[in-house]
UniProtKB/Swiss-Prot annotation:
Annotated heme binding sites: C440
Name of the protein in its database record: Cytochrome P450 monooxygenase astJ
Induction: Expression is regulated by the secondary metabolite regulator cclA.
Homology family: Belongs to the cytochrome P450 family.
Length: 500
């Protein structure tokens, strides 16, 4: 199906300048999306979107445009973005029987190679098949089985931070240490072996490779709208960037191969895949691709939200005091903190939800393509072939969805009665893990980790934000955030320590 609407004039019959003028006129006044509001330049050219993406400001630009143009804006000649709760359901939700799904936009999500797709870029049929297997690995039952393993890494994390304090470190880069922790956890869950980041107090080469390639990957993805230019630029990319991408998948392949050759009763992801695999299961290349995906999706994003929690708590002293009091009142000893008990603290949950709202791990868009025949989105018909999306940052920080949208107010998630200041909040607008059948499969794991890690940090340490990180949240985004160091002063509490 063509992604571009036909212009009923043959380009070869018109001089280039006239053709360009005709295309501009068509896109402004004759195109099926000509009735949608947005910047005129974005209606006739992809260049504004490309510039917003490459400068890391797409999330901010969408927020500004929604303030000017309303709930739906035309951000490219053939693309719309929304900020309403209804748009989540209409674009990303489960489809009614007999209706076609909104497929992932191939100009944003790199199409899968034959036989080697993963959960994000797989087509609908392959995604359903892969999800059937991975659901077992992320079920509540498997989470309970994995808890002991995960808690071991969290305890090591706390020990290492206490060790930093004993050695006289005035501040620690918590953004880095949280990444050490979450990468070690996901490495063990995905492959049955950690990366050793916590033990060595440094990134494993594979982890370092992932971080170095994120920004480049985002820019190359934006270039998909200019295929000829993309092909030209690829020829001049430094070989090191190409080699890093190859190395990422080769490391995943090597670890998967090693794990498949190892018999173990430990409850890692591959053990569940192997247990339930059959003729309709995953091929080895698909296991390798999904393992590589899980390493990034299951680590960096969780660390980002935890860093945001600590940052916003430090910027809002009353919120920090309340959560610390809740945690230290609820748990008289460290061993009381576990997945179940940490989930019972309402204010803790509010802090996490509010951090997800203000600093979503993926602040931009995840576009879909309207199926052939078109569909109704927010009560209005949209033709087939149009790219549509909901912007995370722009939706979560919109005054049409949330009272005092740019303030850190965890109580908004607790005070839900009719008399509350937040009674009119559109809580369904907050979908940081996306929505519908292709929402993030690791949501339960992420929440369990975030609650427990945050509780352990604030139970063990008095925390203070270093002035070097006063503007930490003012970051650029390239699919995920390009974060700077989060420097915190940690003062260990005098509490009994468990012995190994």
């Amino acid at each position: 199906m063509s992604r571009r609407f036909p212009i009923q004039v043959a380009q070869s019959e018109i001089p280039p300048i006239a053709w360009g003028l005709w295309r501009m006129v068509y896109r402004l006044w004759l195109h099926p999306l000509s009735g949608y509001p947005g910047p005129r330049l974005a209606a006739v050219s992809n260049l504004p979107y490309f510039a917003w993406t490459c400068t890391g400001n797409l999330h901010l630009r969408l927020q500004e445009l929604h303030k000017v143009y309303g709930d739906v804006i035309r951000i490219r000649p053939n693309a719309l973005t929304y900020r309403t709760p209804e748009a989540w359901t209409d674009i990303y939700g489960h489809r009614k029987p007999g209706t076609l799904p909104f497929s992932k936009d191939p100009e944003f999500f790199m199409p899968a190679q034959a036989g080697s797709s993963h959960m994000i870029n797989a087509n609908e049929k392959d995604h359903t098949r892969q999800k059937r297997l991975l659901n077992h690995a992320f079920s509540e039952r498997s989470l309970r089985q994995q808890e002991h393993l995960i808690m071991g890494y969290i305890d090591l994390f706390i020990q290492r931070l206490r060790g930093q304090a004993r050695m006289g470190a005035e501040t620690v880069n918590m953004e880095e240490w949280l990444n050490f922790l979450t990468f070690d956890i996901i490495g063990d869950l995905a492959f049955g072996e950690p990366f050793g980041c916590l033990q060595n107090s440094e990134y494993h080469p594979w982890v370092a490779t992932i971080f170095k390639s994120i920004k480049t990957g985002a820019i190359l993805r934006a270039l998909n709208i200019y295929p000829i230019l993309l092909g030209f630029i690829r020829r001049f990319l430094p070989k090191s960037l190409v080699q890093k991408r190859i190395a990422h998948y080769q490391m995943s392949k090597d670890r998967v191969t090693r794990r498949l050759q190892t018999e173990t009763s430990r409850p890692d992801f591959i053990s569940y895949i192997l247990k339930y695999n059959d003729d309709r299961g995953m091929s080895t290349p698909e296991i390798e691709m999904n393992a590589a995906l899980l390493i990034q999706a299951g680590s960096e994003t969780t660390a980002t939200v935890l860093a945001a929690c600590l940052y916003f708590l430090q910027k809002n002293a009353a919120c920090h005091r309340r959560l610390v009091q809740d945690i230290r009142s609820a748990f008289t000893q460290e061993t009381d903190i576990n997945f179940l008990s940490a989930a019972q603290l309402p204010y803790m949950n509010g802090v996490i939800e509010e951090s997800l709202r203000l600093f979503p791990p993926a602040p931009g868009i995840g576009p879909r393509v309207v199926p052939k025949g078109g569909a109704r989105i927010c009560g209005r018909y949209v033709p087939g072939g149009v790219s549509v999306s909901v912007g995370h940052y722009s939706t979560f920080r919109s005054a049409r969805n949330f009272t005092r949208p740019n303030e850190f107010l965890p109580q908004r998630w607790l005070d839900r009665d009719a008399e509350s200041e937040f009674a009119s909040d559109q809580t369904m607008a907050l979908q940081p893990f996306s929505y519908g059948p292709r929402a993030c499969i690791g949501r339960n794991l992420a929440y369990a980790e975030m609650r427990t890690i945050l509780a352990k940090i604030l139970w063990h340490f008095d925390v203070q934000l270093d002035e070097r990180s006063a503007d930490w949240a003012n970051s650029k985004s390239y699919i995920v955030w390009e974060k700077g160091p989060l420097w915190l002063k940690l003062h260990p509490r005098n509490v009994p320590q468990e012995t190994d």
